[in-house]
């Protein structure tokens, strides 16, 4: 029988070191379950020996707390089946009664912006006007119908499944979209679903990402979008595309700062001190996370020129920016280690009572 620990289910080793350091600093035993095509499911078969990429469905999973941080962009790193592997592992863990943070229902949110949009809209949040288009053939005609409701207004496309700004482009006309769809540059969504959304203007060229751990506020991050990139991943390991690429513009970008004019030495991520745990939107989001049993998340919103607070993304495999971590009195990774370590201690106390 293995020693109870926190098991982290993921597919990208490059994102793990800050978390590993946090678990070590908090003296929380941790193990990785790396679900890639060439990896096993170490520790899940009830002992400390790595398996060969399989699980015995009749065996009990190793004791401990399981935290899923599978990424919707796994396929961009050559891990096309990682999400399916995770579905299988999470189902096995949940049927066995193990404690799983960000379980199967959260994975389905991570891999579907359609699901995120529906959940946020049903909860009463202001969300972007969105049409989901299945396949490539109807994309242009769907855009014609979409733009007819807001003539002359620009719009964006994005992939239903995937982070890192996958498939996100701004178009001023349907004709521009038609040319893109017929060009070699067209990015086919991994699940075949492309979203059409209103292009929203922010009061200033930034968006805000609020980090939550254990469903509670950690800090809010100001993300400068003046350089024009849709790549908002805060981790050092994320590859940020060249600012100002033709056809792209970041959420909230305005003419006051043209693409490519952002200070090259300035980190686009910084603490937003005016957004605290007492902010009305933060309190609503905490209630939303509790209602939907989402333990760890980064949620993004923008403040628009017409006075709206538009919530547009739920990221359940959140990464933390080093520059933000260096200036924040609270650490995201340490908060996770403390939260999961607390769950582990509580579970062990029940077992030994």
Predicted features along the sequence, with ranges:
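Active-site nucleotide/adenylate-binding loops and adjacent lid/helix of ATP-dependent enzymes
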Residues: 2, 97, 105-205, 248, ...
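Conserved N-proximal alpha/beta basic substrate-recognition cap immediately N-terminal to
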Residues: 11-134
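C-terminal active-site "lid" helix and adjoining low-complexity regulatory extension at the edge
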Residues: 261, 290-296, 303-353
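Protein kinase-like catalytic core scaffold
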Residues: 155, 217-219, 297, 310-312
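Short hydrophobic segments within beta-strands
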Residues: 8-9, 213
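A short acidic, helix-capping loop that chelates divalent metal ions and anchors anionic groups
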Residues: 73-77, 164-167, 322-323
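Short glycine-rich anion-binding loops that position phosphate/pyrophosphate groups of nucleotides
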Residues: 71-74, 160-162, 317
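Phosphate-binding site of ATP-dependent enzymes
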Residues: 166-289
